[in-house]
Structure formats: structure tokens, C-alpha cells
Design a protein with these regions (language model features):
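Short, Lys/Arg-rich, polar N-terminal cytosolic tail immediately upstream
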Residues: 1-12
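Compositionally biased, charge-rich terminal segments
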Residues: 6, 26-33, 259-264
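Membrane-embedded alpha-helical segments of integral membrane proteins
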Residues: 16-63
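Short, aromatic-rich membrane-interface segments at the entry and exit
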Residues: 41-42, 68-74
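Small-residue-rich segments of transmembrane alpha-helices in multi-pass membrane proteins
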Residues: 53, 84-87, 228
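N-terminal signal-anchor transmembrane helix
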Residues: 64, 72-129, 181-183
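Soluble catalytic domains of enzymes that build or remodel membrane lipids, polysaccharides, and related
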Residues: 104, 108, 114-128, 134-320
Length: 320
């Protein structure tokens, strides 16, 4: 009799713990929709993969204790999070065919080197190994200006804007492009234009939305970026650390308002931060393209001593 009571009690405890976890997951799903105006809700939107795994715990628990109705509810929550991942694995990629024979394939590499990082050998080694046509570096400071001297000869066109904060930025190019002074108002960005094929490249580093004030500034940056991209007569490639995942409501607004496409679609989530903790990594370093840009390859590079992983994008531009 005592064993039966203990068994029932343990089953009930497991059930109620599973329900508590399910309630937290439901609350999280609801709160993420308020990410445009609530910085904590914005942060909750970044983890559908991890939340899908967590949702398996109540699913298994309800199955074991024989609570079918509860299992259905928990399974719906798990499916909700899985659904956020499906476009990155099931969508048709930006392009399915190789570039035309007469098209030039351009490689852009974006790397947040981390201002405190001192592993110049790994960063320089990665740049030399990937041989980008255009290199965008964020969190540029005086140390990284000196470190990049090692590859300066490979990039005759350069704009380096170091800062003591985390918002220094650089654009370095092998291609005969022009660095523009015209750039998105209020955004940490560098802009270049290539005459042939006609193309605008934007490198940027957005504020992290870690307070109401920073959320507002980040949203203003996104609005400025969207307006700037819309003004361009030629195709646009926008790369950099946006401090926002692909599931953020504000990020989705940026894609919609700018007319850009997330190059992850059909190629996997390709998370980039934090570099040393794969189980909780989220994709906050981006490569976005406008119509007229055909993506032929996109991948995340190896660790370079930074808390971010670099992003590599190969593409061609349709003739205008």
C-alpha cells in the first residue's frame, strides 16, 4: 500500500513539474511577440532550437505517466518551436544553380574579431585561407588596425574606423569599389559601391538590445538601415553583427522593410554566438541580400579567438 501511494505521488509530482515547465514554455512563446517593445521579450525570441529540446521533457513525462491530453499540449509547444526552424532547412535556397559562365563570383567575409581578442594569428590565418574579395571587420580597435597590417597588401582599398568602444568597423577590398560617406544615419556602418557589377555593400554592427534604451537605439538602427537599402538603385549585400537572431520580430521587420532576404534560408541556422558554447549558440551575425543577388554559398567559419564565428558569403549579381 505504501509503495502504491509513493508511486502515485511520484507520478503526480512528475506530472505537475511537467505542467509547470509547459506553462513556462507557453508563457515564453507569448512573450516573444512583444520583442519590438520589450528587450527581455526580444531575448527570449532567440532560442527556438533550445526551447524545442526543452519541450521534449514534458512530452516524455506526460507519455510516461499516461496523460495523453497533456502530451498533446506539450507536443504543440514543441512543434511551435520546431516550426521556427523549418524554413532554414526546408526552404529553397536563394539559388539552386551555379553562376552563369560570364558572372563574377564575389566572396564577402564578415568577422566580429572581439575587441578584447588578441589572437591575431587565427584571424589573419582565417582571412588568408578564405581569400575574401571584401572583408568586413567589426569591433575594430587600434590593436586590430595594427593586426590587419599583415594582410593590408591584399586589400588596396580600405576604410578603417577604429574605436575604443566595441563599435569600430572596417571594410577592406580587393575589388575596385568606392567607399561612400553616405551611409545609414545613426548606424555603425561602412558602405561601399562596386561599379561593375553594380552593387552596394553595407557592413554594420548594431547595438545589443540589453535595456529599453538600447532596444530603442537598435530599432532605430534597423529602421535607418532599411530606409538606406530601399534608396539604393543597385542590388545590396548587408553583412555584420546585428545582435539579433533571425526570429526576432525587429529583425523580421528589417527584412520586410528593406526588401532583403536572409541567406540562411535553406542552408541551416548557422549559429555564430557564443563561439565556445555550441549548445546555446544563436545566429546573430548575418548576410542579407536584395533581389538581383544570387547566393552560391554561405557558411560559418571556424573559431578565431572571438566570441563570434565569422560568416562567409559567395554570390554573383544579375546584370542590370
Amino acid at each position: 500500500m505504501e509503495q502504491t501511494i509513493a508511486s502515485v505521488s511520484l507520478r503526480e509530482i512528475a506530472r505537475w513539474c511537467a505542467w509547470l515547465l509547459t506553462a513556462l514554455l507557453i508563457t515564453t512563446a507569448v512573450l516573444t511577440s512583444f520583442g519590438r517593445s520589450c528587450w527581455a521579450c526580444e531575448l527570449l525570441s532567440h532560442f527556438p532550437a533550445q526551447l524545442a529540446l526543452v519541450a521534449l521533457i514534458p512530452c516524455v513525462t506526460f507519455a510516461v505517466v499516461g496523460r495523453r491530453r497533456d502530451l498533446v499540449i506539450a507536443a504543440v509547444i514543441a512543434a511551435w518551436n520546431v516550426a521556427a526552424l523549418v524554413p532554414f532547412y526546408a526552404s529553397v535556397p536563394t539559388v539552386l544553380v551555379p553562376p552563369p559562365a560570364d558572372a563574377r563570383v564575389i566572396r564577402v567575409v564578415a568577422v566580429n574579431v572581439a575587441a578584447e581578442n588578441r589572437d591575431r594569428a587565427r584571424v589573419i590565418g582565417f582571412v588568408r585561407a578564405t581569400r575574401p574579395d571584401v572583408l568586413v571587420v567589426t569591433e575594430l580597435n587600434d590593436f586590430w588596425v595594427r593586426a590587419l597590417d599583415a594582410v593590408a597588401a591584399d586589400f588596396p582599398i580600405r576604410r578603417l574606423e577604429p574605436r575604443d568602444s566595441h563599435y569600430g568597423i572596417a571594410l577592406m577590398s580587393r575589388l575596385p569599389l568606392t567607399i561612400l560617406d553616405d551611409k545609414p544615419a545613426g548606424a555603425h556602418a561602412v558602405v561601399a559601391r562596386l561599379p561593375q557589377p553594380r552593387l552596394t555593400i553595407v557592413g554594420t554592427h548594431a547595438f545589443p538590445p540589453l535595456s529599453p534604451q538600447l532596444l530603442l537605439r537598435r530599432n532605430q538602427e534597423f529602421a535607418a538601415l532599411a530606409a538606406f537599402v530601399r534608396r539604393q538603385a543597385e542590388p545590396v549585400v548587408l553583412v555584420g553583427d546585428l545582435n539579433s537572431s533571425s526570429w526576432s520580430p525587429a529583425f523580421r521587420d528589417l527584412l520586410r522593410d528593406a526588401g532583403l532576404r536572409d541567406t540562411r534560408l535553406g542552408r541551416g541556422v548557422q549559429s555564430t554566438w557564443p563561439a565556445w558554447l555550441p549548445m546555446v549558440q544563436i545566429p546573430i551575425d548575418h548576410a542579407l541580400v536584395s533581389p538581383g543577388v544570387r547566393v552560391h554559398g554561405r557558411f560559418v567559419g571556424d573559431r578565431v579567438g572571438s566570441d563570434h564565428l565569422p560568416v562567409v558569403l559567395d554570390f554573383s549579381v544579375d546584370a542590370l
